[in-house]
């Protein structure tokens, strides 16, 4: 069982770390697409990244690549980055403004803290 209060605290911590560089984040169940916590929720992005992640996992397996591990990043136009974190049965998406948030902080602080926080919410 997931403790959604822990998820809410984790989202607030993420907002504190990335400040105004965090445009949006959602944490959702990858089976039904139900968002469990978030900031500036993006239901269309939840559906999109669930599909992309499923296709990516399938294609990597078919190509005999190692499976996805903790996360993947997508460099977007307008100096933005999308990060998708793999928490097993949960996925998390983040949209980050690279002009306002340092990518080093995203990769070395924000992502590891989210991974730890979601693990503790289980």
Regions from the language model: what does each represent?
Residues 1-122:
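Non-catalytic interaction/Regulatory regions outside core domains
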């Amino acid at each position: 069982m997931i403790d959604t209060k822990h998820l809410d605290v984790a989202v607030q911590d993420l907002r504190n770390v990335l400040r105004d560089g965090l445009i949006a984040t959602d944490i959702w169940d990858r089976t039904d697409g139900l968002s469990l916590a978030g900031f500036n929720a993006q239901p269309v992005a939840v559906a999109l990244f669930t599909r992309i992640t499923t296709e990516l996992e399938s294609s990597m397996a078919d190509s005999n690549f190692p499976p996805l591990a903790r996360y993947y990043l997508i460099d977007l136009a307008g100096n933005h980055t999308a990060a998708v974190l793999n928490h097993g049965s949960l996925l998390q998406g983040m949209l980050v403004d690279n002009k306002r948030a340092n990518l080093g902080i995203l990769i070395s602080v924000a992502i590891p803290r989210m991974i730890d926080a979601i693990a503790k919410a289980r």
